[in-house]
Amino acid sequence: MIDLEQFSQSALDACTVDGALLAVPMSVTGRIFYWNTCTFEQAGIDAPKTYEELLTAGNTFREVLGEEYYPLAMDAAARMNLMVSYLESTTGKAWVVDRQLQYSADEIKTGLEFLQALEENHVMPTLAAQQTNGTLDQTPMWQNGQYAGTFAWDADAETYRSALKNASGFLVGDEIAFGGQANGGFSKVYLALASTAAASTRKKRRFWSTFC
């Protein structure tokens, strides 16, 4: 028997469909900020720890380093996750509960305006302007520090660090609180283990005794 008490309920819930536990969560990953402090030093400022500092950093980058430098860059999925974090922080409500969206059209509009504000304040480029052929870590703009930050899974830390030409400035950033209602965040099960119904009882016992 597997002792399910060693797993958090939220992780178990993520592996549960229609009341049935389909897998056992082995690891969880969440979105966090990564910064290239070498570029921030060139701009004469520290990596941001608040929303206000993040907005200020965008304008400072533009004025000091030029139009091609941004404090942040991320793909469409990460932008959506960041918007959810913002909405959770400002409304105190989860994105989805029991497969039902919890936000009104006006609240989602507010979330999109948040992303637009980041673009207008030169915090991050628009998706159209962002030069990405492949993942962000593979682009020259990340590697040479023109894109000085991203919002990515903590499981990908080494991927982003090792891609930098100067990795000495790689920093795992602080949580940025966007509102006082809750600490918004986005996480998912990174690795889960399951055995098929067709597997023999002996094989199942060996499998679970090995990994759990």
Give the location of each predicted region.
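Extracytoplasmic "Venus flytrap"/periplasmic binding protein-like
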Residues: M1-F7, C38-K49, T139-G149, T159, ...
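Short, solvent-exposed loop/beta-turn-alpha elements that line the ligand-binding surface or hinge
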Residues: I2-F7, L72, G92-L112, S162-G184
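Short beta-strand and adjacent tight-turn residues that come in two discontinuous sequence segments
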Residues: F151-W153
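Extracytoplasmic/periplasmic substrate-recognition and gating elements
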Residues: Q42, N121, A163-C212
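Glycine-centered hinge/linker elements that transmit conformational signals in sensory
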Residues: G58, Q100-A129
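Bilobed periplasmic-binding protein-like "clamshell/Venus-flytrap" ligand-binding domains
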Residues: L22-A23, E63-A76, H122
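Hinge/lid segment of periplasmic solute-binding proteins
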Residues: M1-G30, E107, V172-F178, A194
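Short helix-initiation/N-cap motifs at beta->coil->alpha
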Residues: Y51-L55, A128-Q143
